[in-house]
Amino acid sequence: MDAENATWRKEFMWNNDEKRAEMGTKMFCDVSPHIMLNSHGVAEKMASGSKGMDFWEYPLPQLEIIILSIFLLWRLFDMLFKKLGVPIPKFTSMMLVGAVLSEMFGSMQIPCLKHIFIHYNQYMTKVPDTIGAFAFVLDWFLRGVTTDVGIMKKSGTKSVVIGITSMIIPWQIGKLLYSSREKSSILTMTEMEYTVMTFTMSMTPFTCVNMLLTDLKIVHTDFGQIAQSAGMVTDLLAFFLTVSAYVSRDETQGVKMGLAFMAFFIFVYLVRQFMLWVIRHTPEGAPVKNVYLYIGLLLAYLSYLYWSRFLFFGPLGAFALGLAVPNGPPLGSVFIQKFDSFNEGIFLPLFGSLSMIKLDWSFLRKEFGNGRHLHGHMYECFSFLPIVYIAKFATSFLAALATKIPLRDSIILGVIMGTKSSFELGYVLTAFEKDRISLEVLSLLGVYILVNSLLTPMAIHFLYDRSKRFVCYGRRNLKEKPEMQTLVCINKPDNITSMISLLRATSPSKDSPMECCVLHLIELLGQATPTFISHQLQKPKPGSRSYSENVISSFQLFQEVYWDSASINMFTSLTSAKEMHEQICWFALSQGSNLILLSFHRTWEPNGNVIISDDQTLRSLNLNVLKRAPCSVGIFVYRKPIWQTKALESPCRVCLIYVGGNDDKEALALADHMRGNQQVILTVLRLIPTSYADESSLRIHSQMVDMNRHEDQRPGDKSTIIDWTVGDGTETSKILHSVSYDYDLFIVGRRSGVGTTVTRGLGDWMEFEELGVIGDLLASEYFPSRASVLVVQQQE
């Protein structure tokens, strides 16, 4: 940079105070001899002497220093928290960086650092702030992309009750508290500032809840789904309250906003149709063209500008457009893969950190002294916020209890509904820029948001039991619903025929319909990217073969036979072996399945005598699913066709072994579905422990089975009941051996007979714990028959 340009630069940046004072609020222009964004290096200062500029005074190096410093610091905080086992969200680490930088460089007497981090806005355009705002909007768009718009329907009235009460009651309490203060004392804060504080505390935006739950890896839990749904309810409620406030002040403005929203709704609908068209024209397994991704980003920022101009809080427009993008592969997942990590790692930290740097930290230090004397901004703010927070926690907690959510989860829900994060920070910054709150109130609210975002995840981590993350509040089993909602897992081509045979035996009908999701699991090897394909949305490219062509064609034929009573949806998941059980459980949870069907890890030759495969990876998968499943699970040991011929009229002889217990009840419920099939001959073999041999106990035991049998008498019912009194496991083994050739399929509960005389002594010889004591005996190579076995475990 030459001396002339350096002189102009310094005069413009450092010596134009008088010119600014003369011009007042009017703008003025000056012309640089040369426009330079980047420096000539550290040697410039040495060559030009006092007339030269340091490299950090140029806009581009300054921006690079800010980005690099904030990135390194927030990553350092994030790794430190993980090492310590403290579950602090990423955005909280970003805000913490801003607080540390402001305190550190504000007190240090190092001009270059002050100039870069504290006073950069005085001498250059707000490029870092603009990039941070860009990232904030993009983050809202991506949150919309990952959102399942049907989540509220799945949560039902629970989320509506919690969402409405957790916003309305704190809002009213905040207004009453302000009114009482206004009458009893002289306030240093304005009514508008109290309104902003009350609104900030009453809101629980979906994006903040989703961000918190995602960072804590509990986003798919039942209470996590309810919390997100409740967040959506508060978003809608806040929208209508805001529009109502505009209408009450100016009816014309309210009408304009209503028309603007209707126009935007039509626009979102058209975008949704366009996105579905993109998916339909993207071949199965192929990536979406980049041009569609760029169009999506452009539309997101246009939506932001539209909402900023005609509605309010522009990021909501980007979020609403994100909802129009079908979540999951192939389109939604690509948006996340391409933009989320880069945005969250590089650009979003600028928003979180620079927002905290804007706070007046010297004022905060001063106010700590005034707070002890019970007056001033800090006293008013920090005596107001906890009261509204307690009101919000209490209403959320009580509403959760009222909707029959367990006590511990109700407490966690109350904590989640009080979380504060990026939305609240963006909202108070917007209020400050529009002169609705002062810098002092902004500083106090910023500190509260930081402290809240630090303590909330710690409280959740302390209260939450991660081993129960797949547990559902409602019972998901076959006894609760007449409709079978089954998730069939296909690991190998051999599983296709066996699973179709089993589904055929369950006899889907108009009175007892079946909704079946078929999940083809393919193990990823090497460094390939996990992929999830919905075969309802994507079709193979003409001339190419699908990953799951055999699976698709086979189950399509099954659906054609049962077209009026069975609904089949097919999916393919390419993921690593160690994550397959997580994929199955999450998918079953999201689809509302009440039965997961898995294949046993061993396969036999057609005669059922020689083992040809013993897949220990599949066995590990089955064990993990049994431990974590959100619904009932069935493991199918397929040793020979359960239908003797391929003709539809061929009979299938099924034996249900019933001892008692929850697993046997679930097996009985599954057998009830099979009774509707005219080709199924069902026998209930009741093994009665000698402890039940007295008349009263036997009568109670019999009623447990007879209740199911007589509840729904069907024409042509071919089911029978056979009773045996058993003294020990040896007698049980003899009975089962005696009937081994009489049946094609045995159904038994996994924990059937455990702790009773029926299985005494048999447990010592058990080889496969996933089959239970009796199931292991039936599947043993020493069992004379080669009948297939279905082992059922009820949801725990």
From Swiss-Prot:
Membrane topology note: Multi-pass membrane protein
Membrane-crossing segments per the record: 54-74, 93-113, 131-151, 159-179, 194-213, 223-243, 259-279, 285-305, 310-330, 344-364, 382-402, 411-431, 444-464
Keywords: Antiport, Ion transport, Membrane, Potassium, Potassium transport, Transmembrane, Transmembrane helix, Transport
GO cellular component terms, semicolon-separated: membrane
GO terms of molecular function: antiporter activity
Pfam families noted in UniProt: Na_H_Exchanger
Tissue specificity annotation: Preferentially expressed in pollen.
Keyword NAD listed: no
Entry keyword annotation includes Phosphoprotein: no
Annotated GO biological process: potassium ion transport; proton transmembrane transport
Gene3D superfamilies (alphabetical): 1.20.1530.20
Annotated compartments: Membrane
InterPro entries assigned: Cation/H_exchanger_TM, CPA2_transporter, Na+/solute_symporter_sf
Family statement drawn from the similarity comment of this UniProt entry: Belongs to the monovalent cation:proton antiporter 2 (CPA2) transporter (TC 2.A.37) family. CHX (TC 2.A.37.4) subfamily.
Role noted for this protein: May operate as a cation/H(+) antiporter.
Name of this chain's protein: Cation/H(+) antiporter 6B
